[in-house]
A protein has these predicted regions:
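Tryptophan-centric aromatic hotspots in well-structured domains and transmembrane helices
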Residues: 78, 119, 221, 280-281, ...
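AMP-forming adenylation/ATP pyrophosphatase catalytic core
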Residues: 2-5, 9, 13-43, 55, ...
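Hydrophobic/aromatic-lined pockets within catalytic cores
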Residues: 148, 218, 282-286
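Contiguous mid-protein beta-loop-alpha structural module that forms a pocket-lining wall or clamp
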Residues: 176-261, 265-268, 279-280
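Non-catalytic, surface-exposed connector residues within folded enzymatic/regulatory domains
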Residues: 76, 106, 203, 207, ...
Length: 457
């Protein structure tokens, strides 16, 4: 831990540094609460000190949050240190404990970062602003790491200064400030901070870059950190333009409220715009983005395949399917047992987890399933094959398979659509039709049956 006696006042020569209260206040959007992600390190401590000085000028309250990853032996000491600093500054302190253990093939650094941001996103109060101490050198390192991994513009844009996080915003006000300037400020103002010993372990990519590669590069290209951070800003501008174009293409290619894309409309776009739109579409659906290889598989198999084919491209947490002219994105469908049966009284929505949806009923008049038919004796089943029915208003029985084709039901959904039975008679196909003789007419009370995908968890 770096120890020093705290100075009693805060002064910064604004002609030489952007580390001033005035500059920081210009960065802050209006919010009811401002939080500092306080690790105890020099960057977040400097940020906390500046905001503590500015607290009377803030439109909202100020507090600090510390994330204990419970990985290193010193974690408990760091937690105590952060709490002590906040007590001295009379700043409310909040603690989050997470399990940041790495999974197979994942680096400890990445695991800790993922766990930290997940916990912060889930916890952050509505409309609050969370500030972090990441600076210009961090930005330069992030850009280089992304470049070494072959990232596109999104990765090369590195860390945005202002972005959404959970129900609030994430702000990085130090991205124009160098590590050297922050250290100079901290020493001048006699701050005390903790040092993570793992920061010197060059087995980790970022540490290797920081300890060995960047110093060598900076000898040949002075000011490299500032230049790389500026390059990241240029990439961020390109991302904004690409997002604007994708939004326009989405409006032109989106077919329905379900958000599926028209294959024929996609084919009118250039390959670059197709890729751009597909990423945007998946992002809007809240799904993890695929690799470039998988993105090309989507283009090759979904856009160029036979019209009657039903291709599937999947990756962890997401899948893309095609039916006729529609491209559909979704979370992976759960395993389904079509032999399962359920009893339902219509009063409450029925969650059919294994079918991947929710069955519900809305009271209507003059339509839907007649209420007095088999009340309390409804069986919910699934297609076994060979079912036939006569939809209300039709003169003949039809195979359910043919009706699904007529209705445009995607083939992967057909075995999951709930079939409503009364005394072994098929009386309704949820979300599609009521059978002849079981529909409410004129002023009769009825039930409109809806079948919808399970909300994403």
């Amino acid at each position: 831990m770096q120890h020093a006696t705290r100075g009693c006042c805060l002064t910064v020569n604004s002609s030489k540094s952007k580390l001033t209260v005035a500059h920081l206040l210009q960065k802050l959007p209006r919010a009811p609460q401002y939080w500092v992600a306080f690790s105890g390190g020099v960057d977040s401590h400097t940020l906390l000190q500046l905001l503590a000085e500015a607290r009377r000028q803030l439109p909202g309250s100020l507090a600090a949050v510390h994330v204990n990853h419970q990985i290193q032996q010193q974690s408990g000491d760091w937690e105590i240190h952060c709490r002590s600093v906040c007590e001295e500054l009379r700043i409310p302190f909040h603690l989050l404990r997470v399990q940041g253990k790495a999974r197979a093939g994942e680096s400890p650094e990445a695991a800790a970062r993922t766990a930290r941001y997940r916990a912060l996103a889930e916890w952050l109060p509505t409309n609050a602003v969370l500030t972090t101490g990441q600076h210009q050198d961090d930005q330069a390192e992030t850009l280089l790491l992304q470049l070494f991994r072959g990232a596109g513009p999104r990765g090369l844009a590195a860390m945005p200064e202002n972005s959404a996080l959970g129900r609030g915003r994430l702000l990085r006000p130090f991205l124009e400030i160098s590590r050297k300037a922050i250290l100079s400020y901290a020493r001048e103002h006699r701050l005390r901070w903790v040092e993570d010993p793992s920061n010197t372990d060059t087995r980790y990519e970022r540490n290797l870059l920081r300890q060995r590669i960047m110093p060598e590069l900076q000898q040949h290209w002075p000011g490299l950190g500032k230049v790389l951070a500026r390059a990241a800003g240029h990439q961020a501008d390109q991302i904004e333009l690409a997002q604007t174009l994708a939004a326009l293409d989405y409006r032109a290619c989106c077919r329905s409220e379900s958000g599926c894309l028209s294959v024929s409309a996609l084919l009118c776009l250039s390959p670059a715009r197709q890729r751009n739109l597909l990423r945007y579409w998946l992002e809007q659906a809240g799904l993890p983005l695929p690799s470039r290889v998988l993105l090309e598989r989507i283009r090759a198999e979904m856009l160029s395949g036979r019209q009657d084919a039903s291709p599937l491209v999947h990756w962890p947490g997401a899948e893309v399917r095609r039916y006729r002219d529609g491209l559909y994105s979704m979370t992976p469908l759960p395993p389904h047992d079509p032999a399962r049966r359920y009893r339902w009284d219509f009063r409450e929505p029925l969650s059919l987890d294994q079918a991947g949806g929710i069955l519900s009923a809305t009271a209507v008049t003059g339509g839907g399933l007649r209420v007095d038919d088999g009340a309390g004796t409804m069986d919910i089943r699934f297609r076994q094959g060979g079912e036939a029915l006569q939809p209300a208003g039709r003169h003949y029985h039809h195979r359910l398979k043919k009706l699904f084709q007529e209705w445009g039901a995607p083939d992967w959904e057909r075995d999951r659509v709930p079939l409503v039975y009364s005394n072994d008679a098929l009386i309704a196909v949820a979300g599609f039709c009521v059978c002849e003789g079981f529909q409410a007419t004129a002023e009769q009370a009825g039930l409109d049956l809806q079948w919808s995908r399970m909300p994403e968890s």
